[in-house]
Design a protein with these regions (language model features):
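Catalytic cores of nucleotide-enabled group-transfer and carboxylate-activating enzymes in metabolic
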Residues: 11-18, 22-24, 93, 100, ...
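A short C-terminal helix-loop "cap" of Rossmann-like NAD(P)-dependent dehydrogenase/epimerase domains
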Residues: 7-9, 100-102, 127-134, 159-171
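Catalytic helix-loop patch of NAD(P)-dependent Rossmann-fold dehydrogenases
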Residues: 50-68, 72, 77-78, 87-143, ...
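N-terminal Rossmann/SDR dinucleotide-binding element
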Residues: 1-35
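Conserved acidic residues
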Residues: 34, 46, 77
Length: 180
């Protein structure tokens, strides 16, 4: 999306694999960030069933790698881990969930993002509090960013349909989010 928006020359972007700790360390050394926004993920629920190992490597160990880089950074002051609204134990009740509800996730994607939050919480208590690094987590419904053209993602699917002047298909019109 950087190219489509015409901002690829205005934003410093490093493309890499979150599972590669050494590359992440180099990226942190180059960027020397003060604020880290962690949105990297294997975000496709259907793909998590096809390749759960890759999903956990990316979403859990990738978070460990980011946390390690934050922990060893001399410049980071604030860290945000963005997960998903799918982290909650689905109790099939009629009312919305609160942030302090029990974590779970029935499928590999949702569970891996719950694990990502647990990793972050462990790093807060084990390292970040003592280092004075402010840490937050956010549970997003839909996240979109540069290069996000994956199938089975509502926003990219709607954009593709609109560009082609096709009907926008709502796959499950009765679906609700756990906070609704």
């Amino acid at each position: 999306l950087f190219e489509i928006a015409g901002i690829e020359n205005d934003i410093h972007s490093i493309i890499g694999d979150i599972r590669d700790l050494e590359s992440l360390k180099k990226a942190f050394d180059v960027a020397q960030p003060e604020i880290v926004l962690h949105l990297a993920a294997q975000p496709i629920v259907r793909d998590s069933y096809k390749n759960p190992v890759y999903t956990y490597e990316t979403n859990v160990m990738g978070t460990v790698n980011i946390c390690e880089c934050v922990r060893h950074s001399k410049t980071v002051k604030s860290f945000l881990n963005v997960t998903t609204d799918k982290v909650y134990l689905n109790k099939e009740w009629a009312w919305g969930y609160r942030e302090n509800e029990e974590l779970d996730g029935y499928d590999p994607y949702s569970n891996s993002k719950s694990c990502s939050e647990l990793v972050t919480h462990s790093y807060i208590n084990s390292f970040f509090n003592d280092l004075g690094i402010s840490v937050s987590t956010a549970r997003a419904g839909n996240v979109i960013g540069g290069g996000d053209f994956a199938n089975d993602r509502i926003i990219p699917d709607c954009i593709r349909a609109a560009v082609k002047h096709e009907d926008i298909v709502v796959r499950n019109p009765f679906s609700t989010r756990p906070y609704q």
